[in-house]
Amino acid sequence: PWKENKMIDIHSHIVFDVDDGPKNRAESKALLEEAYAQGVRTIVSTSHRRKGMFETPEDKIAANFSEVKQLAREVAPDLNVVYGAEIYFSSDVIEKLEQNIIPKLNGTRYALIEFSMNTPYRDIHSALTKVLMLGITPVVAHIERYHTLENDEKKVRELINMGCYMQINSSSVLKPRLFGDTYKFMKKRARYFLDKGLVHVVASDMHNLDNRPPYMSEAYELIAKKYGAEKARELFETNPSKIINDQLI
């Protein structure tokens, strides 16, 4: 009953040979096919930009992206892929955003920003303040990763009240496995944020079909069951649609 074919995925690694996502065209296409089968119809490509780790030249990412756009047309005529970036915050990011060197999400006011798991709250707060001062609206990637935000409604609300939006990964929505679930703590955090109404978007952060596939349909179903169909639509369709169309949430 929860099958939705209008999902919009604003966090994905679908471009081959540019980061830790797909290695080649075939892997890119396999991801696109799986996402489409799950009901995703628009994917924002957010390859990593991270100083010292993922430093693929912008023109190479753009060139490979245009090939992925072509692959999407082969997968299905109604599968839409648009351009973006997952931006790991470092001191040089502000200048690069200001000069439009690194892309925002589909050319909108929204930018997907990530931090390391151990980044202190004051650094997250100050980084997001700097981004906001450029007139850019941060979407904070996978908030369930950051230790400083664990069980801390007050901090997350503060970031939201500043004007930021919060994203969690679909993999973190899944039920924890009984044994050997390395990511159990992230699933607990994600559930806390959902319970408190602190999540604006669920997205896949898919990298490959082996260990980081999209779990969009599964996550959609779980959220629809637990929080209602309207909430599921809001997190997987309505809000992501507003983001890629440069509208306010």
Regions of interest found by a model, annotated:
Residues 216-249:
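Mid-to-C-terminal alpha-helical segments outside catalytic/metal-binding sites
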Residues 1-79:
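An N-terminally biased module of ancient metal coordination in phosphate/nucleic-acid-related enzymes
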Residues 36, 132, 194-195:
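Non-catalytic positions within long, well-ordered alpha-helices that form the structural scaffold/packing
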Residues 13-15, 19, 48-49, 84-90, ...:
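Active-site beta-loop-alpha junctions enriched in small/polar residues
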Residues 8-10, 44-46, 82-85, 139-141, ...:
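Active-site neighborhood of phospho(di)ester-bond hydrolases with catalytic His/Asp-centered motifs
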Residues 196-213:
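Short acidic/histidine-rich active-site segments
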Residues 55-167:
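Extended substrate/RNA-proximal surfaces in nucleic-acid metabolism proteins
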Residues 24-27, 60-62, 96-97, 151-157, ...:
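Charged helix-capping and loop-helix junction motifs
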